[in-house]
């Protein structure tokens, strides 16, 4: 503590309320040990100074005590804060770890919530997209159904008008009547006038689906280079103007251009006898009205001329020729000029012979149901498939193994080659047609060249004379050394042989050995040999031998009676002798050379021929049944493909 001044110490030593005489009687305490002389004046001054000093000292002590208390309180607070800080420092690490753990847990929970929310949003978006796509598909189907119903109704109206209205001039064609006067006319006139009113409404309020179809059609025509009377940009701008009018009904006006009408509206305009020349009839050119006449096959509908009497070529005629492919057609201009060929990839238009089983096209006055079916069957020609070398080699190997594929084999082959089932089927159809043509041409060339040995090898079989016989299938089946050909191969070999021999009325082998038959003798059940020149396809040695045999037969017929006048026993004995001679000669030829003989020998007997004919008929019936089953399977496949499309 600080030292007190002398007067404070004196005041502290003496009581506060002490009498002044006490200080006066002790001069040493006041003077600091130095005695002073006592006088009355000095004593009074000393008493006053002592009282003032005592009062000041009391306040100073109070201040000092208050400051000391404040300092002690501050020290205590600092000590408490230090103690609190030390105790808090001891517990700091577990609090931080717990806080970190809680933060990590909160972050993980928040991340999970975000993921769940995002997944839920994705699911909702997918559901919304699916619902929107489904709604759009339903709307499109409804529009197509509505469009088809409108076309059906229009065709029914056309047929009704064609049956009940006269084909001549219609006096009410150019004069629309108010609705309250329609009841005073016959039903035919009433239908015509009602159709006119519907046309006016459709002209003023075109359907947006019709506008979209027409826009796509014009773009396709412009893209494929078809001639448009006028600038294509004007057509597209006009279509946009009409679509703008469709969205803004207050902009509609009855005197707009008719260039953007759909094929349905053009059919309605061309089929009825209505007032479809109420717009732009005063124009002197044909390009200001109905510029949809881009197809030359349907250029006779709605061409406007300057003369009002011939303002419409189809007025009152009842002939509702629809633009771009007939009344039942729904194809565009570029599709109407193309039809399917044998190399297209469609599966619905070909049978096994490469012929069209669905004939495209429709007549203007046919049945409405047939129009609809033909319009649905008519498709745009697809591009030819570009097969790779590997695909072609695999297809050729498969075709060598079997000429006809089952549905399962065809699907497996298509999956192996990464092709569609339709492409494999079309390739097989075309390849079968080519194979039949090549087989027929090859056999014809062999027959013309006289190479009957190669002809017999092509047929196959162990017995030479039976291999050349048309009924070689049963003989080859009976032969222990020859492989049994399939019924399909037998059928096509015989068909190719018939084509090579120009489809003669006699068996093919009869033409081979007819030159070796003895003169004046005929085979049982067969007519006499034809005159020289009856076998134009034989050449070289065979042609000369046939001519010599025919001339010798004619000379001997003059010397001997005809074979028909002989008795049955004589003819049978002669036949048996000829058979023995021919059998011995054929056996000698087989011993001399291993190649097939040029003269194969006699044909089988009557009983064997009958058996062969019966077996051949049975085989032909089996082949026909198999082909019918194949066609049914193809038709089922086509129906399945049509349903999938």
Curated annotation (Swiss-Prot):
The UniProt regions of compositional bias labelled Basic residues, in chain numbering, are: 106-121, 244-253
* DNA-binding region(s), chain positions: 380-439
Key word Phosphoprotein present: yes
ATP-binding as UniProt keyword: no
InterPro entries in the record: HD, Homeobox_CS, Homeodomain-like_sf, Mediator/Homeobox_domain
List compositional bias (Polar residues) regions by residue number. Answer: 329-339, 583-592
Q: Name one GO biological process term.
A: compound eye photoreceptor cell differentiation
Biased region (Pro residues) positions are: 594-603
Q: Which SMART domains does the record associate with it?
A: HOX (SM00389)
Regions of biased composition (Basic and acidic residues) lie at: 149-165, 618-632
Disulfide-bond pairs as recorded:
none
* Annotated spans, Disordered: 1-50, 86-134, 149-176, 240-259, 265-385, 553-645
Q: Report, as the record phrases it, the tissue specificity of this protein.
A: B-H1 and B-H2 are abundant in the eye-antenna imaginal disk. Expressed in R1 and R6 cells throughout larval stage until 30 hours after puparium formation, at which time expression is seen in the anterior and posterior primary pigment cells. Coexpressed in embryonic glial cells, neurons of the CNS and PNS, most latitudinal anterior cells of the developing notum and the central circular region of the leg and antennal imaginal disk throughout larval development.
What are the Acidic residues biased-composition ranges? 633-645
The record's keywords, sorted A to Z, are: Developmental protein, DNA-binding, Homeobox, Nucleus, Phosphoprotein, Sensory transduction, Vision, Wnt signaling pathway
Q: Which residues form a coiled coil?
A: none
* Pfam families hit by this protein: Homeodomain
MF terms per GO, please? Answer: DNA-binding transcription factor activity, RNA polymerase II-specific; RNA polymerase II transcription regulatory region sequence-specific DNA binding
Q: What positions are modified (Phosphothreonine)?
A: 593
Compartments where found: Nucleus
Low complexity composition bias: which ranges? 18-29, 122-134, 275-316, 362-377, 553-574
Q: What is its main location?
A: nucleus
Q: What does this protein do?
A: B-H1 and B-H2 are regulated by members of the wg signaling pathway; wg and dpp. B-H1 and B-H2 are coexpressed and functionally required in R1 and R6 receptor cells and primary pigment cells for normal eye development. Coexpression is also required for the fate determination of external sensory organs, formation of notal microchaetae, formation of presutural macrochaetae, antennal development and for distal leg morphogenesis; segmentation and specification of tarsal segments 3-5.
Q: What is this protein called?
A: Homeobox protein B-H2
Phylogenetic classification of the source organism: Eukaryota, Metazoa, Ecdysozoa, Arthropoda, Hexapoda
